Amino acid sequence: MIGILTIQIHFPGCSSLKEKRSRLKPLIHRLQREFNVSVAEMDLHDTWQDAVIACALVNTDAGQIQRTLQSVVAWIEKHWPDVQVVDDQVEII
């Protein structure tokens, strides 16, 4: 089974694409390390204060996928206070 988590993120106070990328890149790398998920920026590439990232996870247990992907969202909200999670959606295929 494949789990896909799509997260819309808001970066308050960002005034350039360079600043947005400098804040987004460490977040992506940290998620990859902490949760062993594949992560990529998927949309809103040219918007200064917003981004959409997707996390993908493969596992045989749908419940484990769901728990892990929900943990990703909770972890972002706890450990990255300068980032606002606007929306998140989990899809299991």
Predicted regions and their residues:
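C-terminal structural segments of small proteins and small subunits
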Residues: 57-93
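Short glycine-/aliphatic-rich beta-strand segments at the starts of folded cytosolic domains
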Residues: 3-13
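Structural beta->alpha junctions
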Residues: 11-15, 58-61
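Solvent-exposed alpha-helix faces
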Residues: 25-29, 36, 70
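Short, charge-patterned binding micro-sites
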Residues: 2, 40-61, 92-93
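Amphipathic alpha-helical assembly/interaction segments
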Residues: 16, 30-32, 36-40
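C-terminal binding/interaction regions
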Residues: 20
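A short linear hydrophobic-aromatic micro-motif
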Residues: 37-43, 84-88
